[in-house]
Protein backbone atom coordinates (compact mmCIF):
# COMPACT_ATOMS: atom_id res chain seq x y z
CA UNK A 1 0.00 0.00 0.00
CA UNK A 2 1.10 3.55 -0.75
CA UNK A 3 1.86 5.76 2.24
CA UNK A 4 -0.16 8.98 2.51
CA UNK A 5 0.89 10.37 5.91
CA UNK A 6 3.81 9.53 8.16
CA UNK A 7 3.83 10.87 11.72
CA UNK A 8 7.05 10.57 13.74
CA UNK A 9 7.44 11.42 17.45
CA UNK A 10 4.61 13.94 17.25
CA UNK A 11 4.06 16.04 20.38
CA UNK A 12 1.49 18.66 21.24
CA UNK A 13 1.79 20.53 24.54
CA UNK A 14 -0.58 23.23 25.74
CA UNK A 15 0.97 25.77 28.16
CA UNK A 16 -0.63 26.13 31.60
CA UNK A 17 -1.00 29.58 33.17
CA UNK A 18 1.93 30.27 35.52
CA UNK A 19 1.25 30.93 39.21
CA UNK A 20 3.86 33.73 39.20
CA UNK A 21 6.23 35.46 36.80
CA UNK A 22 9.22 33.48 38.12
CA UNK A 23 7.49 30.08 38.11
CA UNK A 24 8.64 27.41 35.65
CA UNK A 25 6.36 27.04 32.64
CA UNK A 26 4.25 23.86 32.86
CA UNK A 27 2.42 22.10 30.05
CA UNK A 28 -0.52 19.78 29.46
CA UNK A 29 0.84 16.96 27.29
CA UNK A 30 -2.11 16.29 24.99
CA UNK A 31 -0.07 14.18 22.53
CA UNK A 32 3.23 12.56 23.47
CA UNK A 33 5.60 10.80 21.03
CA UNK A 34 2.98 9.53 18.56
CA UNK A 35 4.43 7.60 15.62
CA UNK A 36 2.23 6.02 12.95
CA UNK A 37 1.82 5.64 9.19
CA UNK A 38 -1.47 6.12 7.35
CA UNK A 39 -1.85 4.48 3.93
CA UNK A 40 -3.99 5.50 0.95
CA UNK A 41 -7.50 4.07 1.05
CA UNK A 42 -7.11 3.00 4.68
CA UNK A 43 -9.57 3.65 7.52
CA UNK A 44 -7.70 4.23 10.77
CA UNK A 45 -9.65 4.40 14.03
CA UNK A 46 -8.42 6.11 17.20
CA UNK A 47 -9.94 4.73 20.40
CA UNK A 48 -9.56 6.29 23.84
CA UNK A 49 -11.35 7.81 26.78
CA UNK A 50 -12.64 11.37 26.78
CA UNK A 51 -9.83 13.94 27.01
CA UNK A 52 -7.04 11.58 25.93
CA UNK A 53 -6.07 13.69 22.89
CA UNK A 54 -7.91 12.08 19.94
CA UNK A 55 -9.40 15.32 18.60
CA UNK A 56 -6.14 17.15 19.28
CA UNK A 57 -4.21 14.64 17.16
CA UNK A 58 -6.67 15.03 14.28
CA UNK A 59 -6.33 18.80 14.36
CA UNK A 60 -2.55 18.69 14.70
CA UNK A 61 -2.32 16.44 11.62
CA UNK A 62 -4.18 19.11 9.64
CA UNK A 63 -2.06 21.85 11.28
CA UNK A 64 -5.14 23.49 12.80
CA UNK A 65 -3.06 23.30 15.97
CA UNK A 66 0.67 23.95 15.65
CA UNK A 67 2.59 20.84 16.71
CA UNK A 68 5.17 21.22 19.48
CA UNK A 69 7.66 18.70 18.08
CA UNK A 70 7.98 15.78 15.68
CA UNK A 71 7.30 15.59 11.96
CA UNK A 72 4.17 15.11 9.86
CA UNK A 73 5.09 14.10 6.31
CA UNK A 74 2.41 14.24 3.60
CA UNK A 75 2.89 12.18 0.42
CA UNK A 76 -0.28 13.17 -1.46
CA UNK A 77 1.78 15.83 -3.27
CA UNK A 78 5.45 16.09 -4.18
CA UNK A 79 7.84 18.85 -3.15
CA UNK A 80 8.00 19.93 -6.80
CA UNK A 81 4.26 20.69 -7.00
CA UNK A 82 3.93 22.35 -3.58
CA UNK A 83 7.23 24.28 -3.91
CA UNK A 84 7.62 25.01 -0.17
CA UNK A 85 9.87 27.87 0.89
CA UNK A 86 11.60 25.76 3.56
CA UNK A 87 13.30 23.64 0.87
CA UNK A 88 15.01 26.63 -0.74
CA UNK A 89 15.88 28.06 2.69
CA UNK A 90 17.54 24.77 3.72
CA UNK A 91 19.57 24.60 0.51
CA UNK A 92 20.63 28.26 0.58
CA UNK A 93 21.78 27.91 4.20
CA UNK A 94 22.89 24.26 4.08
CA UNK A 95 26.11 24.74 6.04
CA UNK A 96 24.23 26.64 8.75
CA UNK A 97 21.68 23.80 9.10
CA UNK A 98 24.48 21.20 9.32
CA UNK A 99 26.26 23.33 11.94
CA UNK A 100 23.02 23.67 13.94
CA UNK A 101 22.66 19.88 13.90
CA UNK A 102 26.17 19.33 15.31
CA UNK A 103 25.58 21.98 18.01
CA UNK A 104 22.25 20.35 18.95
CA UNK A 105 23.89 16.91 19.22
CA UNK A 106 26.69 18.31 21.43
CA UNK A 107 24.13 20.03 23.68
CA UNK A 108 22.01 16.85 23.93
CA UNK A 109 25.07 14.81 24.93
CA UNK A 110 26.03 17.42 27.54
CA UNK A 111 22.52 17.39 29.06
CA UNK A 112 22.45 13.57 29.08
CA UNK A 113 25.80 13.43 30.95
CA UNK A 114 24.60 16.03 33.45
CA UNK A 115 21.39 14.09 34.11
CA UNK A 116 23.24 10.76 34.42
CA UNK A 117 25.72 12.29 36.89
CA UNK A 118 22.86 13.41 39.14
CA UNK A 119 21.42 9.89 39.16
CA UNK A 120 18.47 9.59 41.55
CA UNK A 121 18.87 13.26 42.52
CA UNK A 122 17.83 14.36 39.01
CA UNK A 123 14.63 16.43 39.21
CA UNK A 124 11.69 16.36 36.82
CA UNK A 125 13.02 19.55 35.20
CA UNK A 126 16.50 18.03 34.67
CA UNK A 127 14.95 15.07 32.86
CA UNK A 128 12.66 17.38 30.88
CA UNK A 129 15.64 19.51 29.75
CA UNK A 130 17.49 16.34 28.71
CA UNK A 131 14.52 15.10 26.67
CA UNK A 132 13.97 18.49 25.03
CA UNK A 133 17.66 18.66 24.04
CA UNK A 134 17.44 15.19 22.46
CA UNK A 135 14.26 16.26 20.66
CA UNK A 136 15.99 19.40 19.31
CA UNK A 137 18.86 17.27 17.97
CA UNK A 138 16.41 14.94 16.20
CA UNK A 139 14.55 17.92 14.71
CA UNK A 140 17.81 19.48 13.46
CA UNK A 141 18.73 16.17 11.81
CA UNK A 142 15.32 15.92 10.13
CA UNK A 143 15.47 19.48 8.83
CA UNK A 144 18.85 18.94 7.17
CA UNK A 145 18.94 15.26 6.16
CA UNK A 146 15.49 15.09 4.54
CA UNK A 147 16.53 17.75 2.02
CA UNK A 148 20.32 17.38 1.72
CA UNK A 149 20.67 13.61 2.09
CA UNK A 150 24.28 12.43 1.79
CA UNK A 151 25.50 15.93 0.96
CA UNK A 152 24.98 16.72 4.62
CA UNK A 153 28.31 15.02 5.37
CA UNK A 154 30.12 15.18 2.00
CA UNK A 155 30.79 18.26 -0.11
CA UNK A 156 27.87 20.16 1.43
CA UNK A 157 28.34 23.46 -0.44
CA UNK A 158 28.57 21.90 -3.91
CA UNK A 159 25.79 19.36 -3.30
CA UNK A 160 23.44 22.02 -1.92
CA UNK A 161 24.16 24.18 -4.97
CA UNK A 162 23.24 21.36 -7.36
CA UNK A 163 20.07 20.55 -5.39
CA UNK A 164 19.13 24.24 -5.29
CA UNK A 165 19.53 24.52 -9.07
CA UNK A 166 17.36 21.44 -9.60
CA UNK A 167 14.58 22.61 -7.25
CA UNK A 168 14.50 26.12 -8.72
CA UNK A 169 13.80 24.72 -12.19
CA UNK A 170 11.23 22.24 -10.80
CA UNK A 171 9.45 24.96 -8.80
CA UNK A 172 9.34 27.21 -11.88
CA UNK A 173 7.79 24.38 -13.90
CA UNK A 174 5.15 23.88 -11.17
CA UNK A 175 4.36 27.63 -11.05
CA UNK A 176 3.97 27.78 -14.85
CA UNK A 177 1.68 24.73 -14.81
CA UNK A 178 -0.46 26.43 -12.16
CA UNK A 179 -0.79 29.52 -14.38
CA UNK A 180 -1.75 27.33 -17.35
CA UNK A 181 -4.46 25.64 -15.26
CA UNK A 182 -5.86 29.04 -14.21
CA UNK A 183 -6.15 30.14 -17.85
CA UNK A 184 -7.90 26.86 -18.73
CA UNK A 185 -10.37 27.53 -15.91
CA UNK A 186 -11.03 31.04 -17.26
CA UNK A 187 -11.67 29.57 -20.73
CA UNK A 188 -14.08 26.99 -19.29
CA UNK A 189 -16.02 29.74 -17.48
CA UNK A 190 -16.17 31.93 -20.61
CA UNK A 191 -17.43 28.99 -22.68
CA UNK A 192 -20.21 28.50 -20.12
CA UNK A 193 -21.15 32.22 -20.30
CA UNK A 194 -21.18 32.14 -24.12
CA UNK A 195 -23.40 29.06 -24.07
CA UNK A 196 -25.90 30.53 -21.58
CA UNK A 197 -25.90 34.10 -22.94
CA UNK A 198 -25.57 34.17 -26.77
CA UNK A 199 -25.37 37.99 -26.77
CA UNK A 200 -21.99 37.80 -25.01
CA UNK A 201 -20.64 35.06 -27.30
CA UNK A 202 -18.52 37.40 -29.47
CA UNK A 203 -16.95 39.11 -26.45
CA UNK A 204 -16.25 35.74 -24.80
CA UNK A 205 -14.67 34.36 -27.98
CA UNK A 206 -12.25 37.30 -28.07
CA UNK A 207 -11.26 36.72 -24.42
CA UNK A 208 -10.88 32.97 -25.04
CA UNK A 209 -8.43 33.63 -27.89
CA UNK A 210 -6.42 35.94 -25.60
CA UNK A 211 -6.25 33.24 -22.88
CA UNK A 212 -5.31 30.59 -25.46
CA UNK A 213 -2.42 32.76 -26.71
CA UNK A 214 -1.15 33.10 -23.13
CA UNK A 215 -1.48 29.33 -22.64
CA UNK A 216 0.64 28.65 -25.74
CA UNK A 217 3.31 31.07 -24.48
CA UNK A 218 3.31 29.52 -20.98
CA UNK A 219 3.44 25.97 -22.36
CA UNK A 220 6.66 26.78 -24.23
CA UNK A 221 8.18 28.18 -21.02
CA UNK A 222 6.93 25.12 -19.10
CA UNK A 223 8.61 22.72 -21.56
CA UNK A 224 11.89 24.64 -21.18
CA UNK A 225 11.63 24.49 -17.36
CA UNK A 226 10.93 20.73 -17.44
CA UNK A 227 13.93 20.18 -19.75
CA UNK A 228 16.15 22.26 -17.43
CA UNK A 229 14.94 20.20 -14.43
CA UNK A 230 15.80 16.94 -16.20
CA UNK A 231 19.26 18.25 -17.10
CA UNK A 232 19.87 19.34 -13.48
CA UNK A 233 18.81 15.87 -12.28
CA UNK A 234 21.41 14.24 -14.56
CA UNK A 235 24.19 16.44 -13.12
CA UNK A 236 22.97 15.64 -9.59
CA UNK A 237 22.90 11.89 -10.30
CA UNK A 238 26.48 12.03 -11.62
CA UNK A 239 27.64 13.79 -8.44
CA UNK A 240 25.88 11.23 -6.23
CA UNK A 241 27.47 8.38 -8.19
CA UNK A 242 30.90 9.51 -6.92
CA UNK A 243 29.89 8.48 -3.38
CA UNK A 244 28.20 5.17 -4.30
CA UNK A 245 30.67 3.20 -2.15
CA UNK A 246 30.78 5.61 0.78
CA UNK A 247 28.78 4.12 3.73
CA UNK A 248 28.51 7.45 5.59
CA UNK A 249 27.13 9.22 2.51
CA UNK A 250 24.66 6.37 1.89
CA UNK A 251 23.52 6.42 5.52
CA UNK A 252 22.36 10.04 5.24
CA UNK A 253 21.21 9.62 1.64
CA UNK A 254 18.71 7.02 2.92
CA UNK A 255 17.15 9.80 5.05
CA UNK A 256 16.11 11.78 1.95
CA UNK A 257 12.34 12.28 1.96
CA UNK A 258 10.27 13.57 -0.96
CA UNK A 259 7.21 14.10 1.26
CA UNK A 260 5.97 17.54 2.31
CA UNK A 261 6.71 18.42 5.95
CA UNK A 262 3.42 20.01 7.02
CA UNK A 263 4.97 21.46 10.18
CA UNK A 264 7.39 23.61 8.18
CA UNK A 265 4.87 25.04 5.72
CA UNK A 266 3.89 28.70 5.87
CA UNK A 267 0.22 29.69 6.14
CA UNK A 268 -0.23 30.32 2.39
CA UNK A 269 1.48 27.04 1.48
CA UNK A 270 -0.66 25.07 3.95
CA UNK A 271 -3.77 26.75 2.55
CA UNK A 272 -3.00 25.24 -0.87
CA UNK A 273 -3.20 21.77 0.71
CA UNK A 274 -6.46 22.40 2.57
CA UNK A 275 -8.47 20.86 -0.27
CA UNK A 276 -6.47 17.63 0.15
CA UNK A 277 -6.85 17.51 3.95
CA UNK A 278 -10.36 17.99 5.30
CA UNK A 279 -12.16 17.53 8.63
CA UNK A 280 -15.74 16.71 9.65
CA UNK A 281 -16.26 18.34 13.04
CA UNK A 282 -17.91 16.74 16.06
CA UNK A 283 -20.80 19.22 16.42
CA UNK A 284 -22.37 19.96 13.02
CA UNK A 285 -24.36 23.02 14.06
CA UNK A 286 -21.45 24.97 15.58
CA UNK A 287 -19.30 24.29 12.49
CA UNK A 288 -21.86 25.76 10.04
CA UNK A 289 -22.35 29.49 9.42
CA UNK A 290 -26.02 30.20 10.31
CA UNK A 291 -26.11 33.13 7.86
CA UNK A 292 -25.22 31.00 4.84
CA UNK A 293 -27.46 28.66 2.87
CA UNK A 294 -26.50 25.05 2.17
CA UNK A 295 -25.51 26.02 -1.37
CA UNK A 296 -23.26 28.86 -0.16
CA UNK A 297 -21.66 26.62 2.49
CA UNK A 298 -20.66 23.98 -0.08
CA UNK A 299 -19.72 26.53 -2.77
CA UNK A 300 -17.42 28.47 -0.42
CA UNK A 301 -14.69 25.80 -0.54
CA UNK A 302 -15.07 25.30 -4.29
CA UNK A 303 -14.50 29.01 -4.95
CA UNK A 304 -11.68 29.36 -2.39
CA UNK A 305 -9.77 26.41 -3.85
CA UNK A 306 -10.42 27.52 -7.45
CA UNK A 307 -12.54 24.59 -8.61
CA UNK A 308 -14.95 27.16 -10.05
CA UNK A 309 -15.11 30.91 -10.49
CA UNK A 310 -17.76 32.76 -8.47
CA UNK A 311 -20.94 32.92 -10.58
CA UNK A 312 -19.96 29.98 -12.79
CA UNK A 313 -23.03 28.30 -14.31
CA UNK A 314 -21.37 24.90 -13.99
CA UNK A 315 -20.90 25.07 -10.24
CA UNK A 316 -24.54 24.60 -9.22
CA UNK A 317 -24.99 21.20 -10.99
CA UNK A 318 -21.77 20.01 -9.30
CA UNK A 319 -23.09 21.13 -5.89
CA UNK A 320 -26.37 19.28 -6.55
CA UNK A 321 -24.41 16.14 -7.45
CA UNK A 322 -22.40 16.38 -4.21
CA UNK A 323 -25.56 16.96 -2.15
CA UNK A 324 -27.25 13.93 -3.72
CA UNK A 325 -24.24 11.74 -2.90
CA UNK A 326 -24.61 12.76 0.74
CA UNK A 327 -28.37 12.14 0.89
CA UNK A 328 -29.48 15.77 0.49
CA UNK A 329 -32.17 16.79 -2.01
CA UNK A 330 -31.79 19.64 -4.54
CA UNK A 331 -34.61 21.70 -2.96
CA UNK A 332 -32.49 22.03 0.21
CA UNK A 333 -29.97 24.21 -1.69
CA UNK A 334 -31.47 27.52 -0.46
CA UNK A 335 -32.21 26.44 3.11
CA UNK A 336 -30.33 27.54 6.23
CA UNK A 337 -28.71 25.21 8.84
CA UNK A 338 -31.40 25.89 11.50
CA UNK A 339 -34.01 24.37 9.16
CA UNK A 340 -32.40 20.91 9.33
CA UNK A 341 -32.26 18.09 11.86
CA UNK A 342 -28.93 17.07 13.47
CA UNK A 343 -28.36 14.21 11.03
CA UNK A 344 -29.06 16.42 8.01
CA UNK A 345 -26.67 19.08 9.32
CA UNK A 346 -23.93 16.48 9.57
CA UNK A 347 -24.67 15.47 5.96
CA UNK A 348 -24.11 19.13 5.00
CA UNK A 349 -20.74 19.06 6.81
CA UNK A 350 -19.80 15.86 4.98
CA UNK A 351 -20.87 17.36 1.63
CA UNK A 352 -18.81 20.50 2.34
CA UNK A 353 -15.71 18.40 3.07
CA UNK A 354 -16.09 16.03 0.12
CA UNK A 355 -16.97 18.72 -2.45
CA UNK A 356 -13.30 19.73 -2.78
CA UNK A 357 -12.27 16.10 -3.52
CA UNK A 358 -9.98 15.55 -0.52
CA UNK A 359 -7.45 12.74 -0.21
CA UNK A 360 -7.58 12.53 3.59
CA UNK A 361 -10.52 13.23 5.92
CA UNK A 362 -10.48 13.43 9.72
CA UNK A 363 -13.86 12.41 11.17
CA UNK A 364 -13.78 13.92 14.65
CA UNK A 365 -16.42 11.75 16.39
CA UNK A 366 -18.84 12.94 13.72
CA UNK A 367 -21.82 11.03 15.21
CA UNK A 368 -21.37 11.67 18.94
CA UNK A 369 -23.70 14.71 18.90
CA UNK A 370 -26.46 12.82 17.04
CA UNK A 371 -29.36 10.61 18.11
CA UNK A 372 -28.65 6.88 18.23
CA UNK A 373 -31.34 6.23 15.60
CA UNK A 374 -29.45 8.12 12.89
CA UNK A 375 -25.85 7.45 13.95
CA UNK A 376 -25.64 4.30 11.81
CA UNK A 377 -26.78 6.23 8.70
CA UNK A 378 -24.07 8.85 9.14
CA UNK A 379 -21.42 6.20 9.88
CA UNK A 380 -22.35 4.27 6.72
CA UNK A 381 -22.31 7.41 4.54
CA UNK A 382 -18.52 8.12 4.73
CA UNK A 383 -17.90 4.37 4.39
CA UNK A 384 -19.85 4.25 1.11
CA UNK A 385 -18.20 7.44 -0.17
CA UNK A 386 -14.76 6.10 0.80
CA UNK A 387 -15.27 3.06 -1.43
CA UNK A 388 -16.48 5.21 -4.35
CA UNK A 389 -13.96 8.06 -4.04
CA UNK A 390 -10.95 6.16 -2.64
CA UNK A 391 -10.77 8.33 0.48
CA UNK A 392 -8.47 7.80 3.45
Walk through the language-model features, giving the residues of each.
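A short, proline-enriched helix->beta-strand linker immediately N-terminal to the Walker B motif
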Residues: 355-359, 375, 388
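Conserved ABC transporter NBD signature motif
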Residues: 70-81, 164-167, 245-261
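Q-loop/switch helix immediately C-terminal to the Walker
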Residues: 292-304
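Conserved ABC ATPase signature
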Residues: 336-340, 344
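Conserved ABC ATPase "signature" region
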Residues: 313-331, 382
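Hydrophobic anchor residue at the start of the ABC signature
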Residues: 350, 362, 378
Amino acid sequence: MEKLLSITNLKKYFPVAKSSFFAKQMYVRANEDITLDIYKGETLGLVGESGCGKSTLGRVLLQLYEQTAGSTMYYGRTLDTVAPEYVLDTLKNAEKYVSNYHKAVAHAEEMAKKCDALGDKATFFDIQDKNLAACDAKTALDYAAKILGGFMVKDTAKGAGLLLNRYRHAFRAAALQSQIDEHHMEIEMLEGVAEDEPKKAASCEKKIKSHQAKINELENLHKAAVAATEEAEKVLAAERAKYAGDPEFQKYEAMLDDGVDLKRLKYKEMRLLRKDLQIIFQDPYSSLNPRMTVGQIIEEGLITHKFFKRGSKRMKPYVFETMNKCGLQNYMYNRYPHQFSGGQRQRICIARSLAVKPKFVVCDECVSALDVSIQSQIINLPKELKEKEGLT
